[in-house]
């Protein structure tokens, strides 16, 4: 049956004049190109990776330009110091917004590099097998370059990660087809990564220093002795 249909179509094309054949092919090619471009727009309208760069689509992101206050700290003008005061450490704040990664997953990487020197953080991030580690590493490298070029830091290795945290970005909701005509909801999450590098060597204990059992006992005993007795003189 397919052979018969193919032969009939070939006979119809042979019988058609050349001018009509050219018009038919031109009219067929124009809608195909139009449909192709329209299909591309329709496909991208359901996803966040529109455009060649894979960034957020401009039509989706009109009313949200990302966080703005974090970079304002770089423009802070501090008052002059007295000669006997300790020199104020230089710092630089940097961020990367709208990263196509879950903020819950990025939190582990951001908390991992807190309190490390820049060289140690970059070295450790090479062994973190997570997608967000690449963005964190690139952001720290950009902040390191900014500190040397714009914030009068003499040695780029004399920096440590003073702050490193994550913010929640935009969440786009989509649909995923399931079997038997059903569908499921999909969330395309984005996050913002913030980092602040400070000049100098990192502290020995970035978080609270762990206490020995004797210190814990003394602290508990002090709390017990400082209790207030209700309705007493």
Swiss-Prot record:
Record's keyword annotation contains Ribosomal protein: yes
UniProt-listed CDD domains: Ribosomal_L22
A GO-annotated cellular component: mitochondrion
Compartment(s) of residence: Mitochondrion
Record keyword Transit peptide present: yes
Matching InterPro entries: Ribosomal_uL22 (IPR001063), Ribosomal_uL22_bac/org-type (IPR047867), Ribosomal_uL22_sf (IPR036394)
Keywords carried by this UniProt record: Mitochondrion, Ribonucleoprotein, Ribosomal protein, Transit peptide
Subunit structure comment from the entry: Component of the mitochondrial ribosome large subunit (39S) which comprises a 16S rRNA and about 50 distinct proteins.
Similarity comment text for this entry: Belongs to the universal ribosomal protein uL22 family.
Protein name: Large ribosomal subunit protein uL22m
Lineage: Eukaryota, Metazoa, Ecdysozoa, Arthropoda, Hexapoda
Gene name of this polypeptide: mRpL22
């Amino acid at each position: 049956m397919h052979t018969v249909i193919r032969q009939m179509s070939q006979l119809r094309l042979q019988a058609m004049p050349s001018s009509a054949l050219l018009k038919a092919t031109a009219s067929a090619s124009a809608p195909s190109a139009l449909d192709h471009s329209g299909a591309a727009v329709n496909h991208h309208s359901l996803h966040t990776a529109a455009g060649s760069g894979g960034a957020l689509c401009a039509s989706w992101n009109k009313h949200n330009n990302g966080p703005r206050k974090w970079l304002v700290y770089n423009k802070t003008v501090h008052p002059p110091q007295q000669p006997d005061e300790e020199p104020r450490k230089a710092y630089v704040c940097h961020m990367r917004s709208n990263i196509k990664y879950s903020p819950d997953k990025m939190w582990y990487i951001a908390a991992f590099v807190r309190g490390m020197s820049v060289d140690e953080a970059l070295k450790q991030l090479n062994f973190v097998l997570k997608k967000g580690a690449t963005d964190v590493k690139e952001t720290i490298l950009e902040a390191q370059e900014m500190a040397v070029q714009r914030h009068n830091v003499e040695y780029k290795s004399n920096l440590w990660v003073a702050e490193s945290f994550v913010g929640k970005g935009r969440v786009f909701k989509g649909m995923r087809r399931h079997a038997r005509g059903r569908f499921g909801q999909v969330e395309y999450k984005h996050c913002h990564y913030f980092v602040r590098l400070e000049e100098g060597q990192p502290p020995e204990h970035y978080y609270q220093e762990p206490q020995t059992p004797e210190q814990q006992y003394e602290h508990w005993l002090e709390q017990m002795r400082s209790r207030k007795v209700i309705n007493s003189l």
